[in-house]
Amino acid sequence: MMHCLVGSEMCIRDSNWSYQSHFVLYLEALMRQQTLLPTYIKEMIFAYISGLNGCQYCKNIHAEISKKLLREANDEQPLLDIENAGIEEKYKPILKLAHKVNADIKSIVDEDVDQILQYGFDEQVISEIISICGAAQFMNTVVVAHQIKPLDDVQNIGSAKMMIEKGYDGLAEYMISKRNK
């Protein structure tokens, strides 16, 4: 007998939907709302944190979304090596802060924030980075604990395309349609 814990998106969708649906709405507001951070950077942060946490399912989807939004061929570099990443210089301190939020939140110092603010970002961006990291950590925990396997390349590209076209609301609609079958 397969327990709900192991490898099934249905476990998340069916048994936890009453509260998971609210989280999807939160993700829609957090990740898709127009702010000083472009959506591709938000998705890159989510992918980066997911990679650090060993959640290949989330890393792959969010990296694909970021890549498609950025229209660059190589999404791995920013996720593995911040200093040599092929992104604008102003976004590197953002990824460094995200790393500290994920790895050792108490290690954050004023200089980390100042490095971001010097590029013209406001303090709302700091809160946004922290919130994206928290959202990624939560989803990584849910996905890894349920032992959900990464999608294959075709499914991953399709999921990224759906997320770009329909947002997290599209994900919610998809999950509801599957639940109602």
Where are these regions (language model features)?
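Amphipathic, charged-and-aliphatic alpha-helical interface segments
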Residues: 47, 89-108, 130-133
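Iron-sulfur (Fe-S) cluster-binding segments and ferredoxin-like electron-carrier domains
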Residues: 20-21, 59-76, 149-151
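Short acidic alpha-helix initiation/capping motifs at coil-to-helix transition points
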Residues: 18-24, 56-58, 102-111
